[in-house]
Amino acid sequence: MSQFDVTVFTDGSCLGNPGPGGWAAIMRCNGCEKELSGGFALTTNNRMEILAVLEALEALRDPCKVTLFTDSQYVRNAVEKKWLAGWQRNGWKTADKKPVKNRDLWERLVPLLAKHSVSFRWVRGHSGHPENERCDVLARAQASRRGLPEDPGFTA
């Protein structure tokens, strides 16, 4: 069975850091497009950036070849520079022996990276990239909503 080629654009936003936050993803495959977004009452920008990637990859039922555009160097570097693999090897500790932040989200991401063939592409945020700008609008709209749920993994 051949893999579908999927293009994903993601962004996360936080109004204050920590503060209310939102995430968004635009997914394209075979001429179809889908927008996903959500948010939490109290979270961080990095959690929202990771969650945007997670939610997009979790939405893909079958293994896919994914080209993922993000403005988050944190997410991209964690995967491409093998920080994630190192954190796992070190019992979820950083190089200076501190607990890895956002471990709950990283642990959800690991099997998705094994399931899908994901290639990250960095885009400069707020530089006029149409899909990144659209994701930013969606993420900010989510962060601005009233009655957002609590982020179960956020710790101050």
Swiss-Prot record:
GO terms for cellular component: cytoplasm. Mg(2+) 1 binds at residues 11, 49, 71. Its main location: cytoplasm. Keywords: Cytoplasm, Endonuclease, Hydrolase, Magnesium, Metal-binding, Nuclease. Endonuclease that specifically degrades the RNA of RNA-DNA hybrids. Belongs to the RNase H family. PANTHER family: RIBONUCLEASE H1. This is Ribonuclease H.
